[in-house]
């Protein structure tokens, strides 16, 4: 990030108002109007870590707090486009951690219909690289892609724990696709669509992958 403490034609000595600098540092949060929303929202928007919450001794307390937060968030109707865009990006970055922490997919999907930019395009053939154990428990994640190669990457890698991974296939419609890919997801070439699995007509297993070693 470019530092603007001294302009090219400025004198060598500059009086710096530290209070003004502090205000500038927090300007983005002021612009986003975060004071009107639950405090934990800043944790998501700032990309803070979730490991200390899930791996510490107070995980039950943190889970309760985050469930309350997600429930409260679902009651808001955000109107700030910059806020929505930032949330969309950070959801794609950390949704697997948020999902593990909250441990309530229905609660999360209800919230996402309010907080992600609505998809209104045509129906799409979509794929997901899912963990076999979670699939058999009906715990299918929200992240799908129109690129089968992306699903294969996850089914044979990150999600191939336990008994292995599977590539799932479905037809997503505007009634089941909550949001399309964020700019961040497109940059990563993952093309992640956020899906409400409760609204899918069918989900089929395309292929299996052996458990990941190591």
Q: Where does each model-flagged region fall?
A:
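Conserved NAD+-utilizing ADP-ribose enzyme module
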Residues: 1-125, 132-142, 146-214
């Amino acid at each position: 990030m470019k530092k603007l403490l001294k302009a090219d034609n400025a004198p060598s000595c500059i009086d710096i108002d530290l209070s003004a600098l502090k205000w500038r540092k927090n300007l983005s949060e002021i612009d986003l109007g975060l004071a009107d929303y639950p405090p934990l929202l800043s944790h998501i928007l700032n990309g803070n870590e979730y490991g200390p919450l899930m791996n510490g001794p107070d995980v039950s307390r943190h889970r309760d707090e985050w469930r309350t937060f997600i429930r409260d968030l679902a009651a808001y109707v955000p109107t700030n486009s910059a806020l929505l865009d930032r949330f969309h990006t950070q959801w794609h970055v950390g949704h697997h951690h948020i999902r593990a922490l909250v441990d309530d997919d229905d609660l999360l999907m209800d919230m996402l219909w309010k907080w992600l930019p609505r998809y209104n395009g045509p129906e799409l053939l979509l794929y997901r690289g899912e963990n076999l154990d979670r699939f058999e428990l009906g715990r299918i994640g929200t992240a799908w892609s129109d690129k089968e190669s992306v699903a294969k990457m996850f089914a044979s890698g990150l999600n191939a724990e336990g008994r292995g991974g599977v590539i799932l296939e479905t037809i997503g419609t505007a009634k089941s696709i909550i949001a399309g890919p964020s700019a961040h997801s497109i940059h990563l070439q993952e093309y992640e669509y956020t899906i409400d699995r409760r609204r899918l007509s069918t989900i089929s297993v395309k292929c299996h992958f052996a458990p990941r070693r190591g």
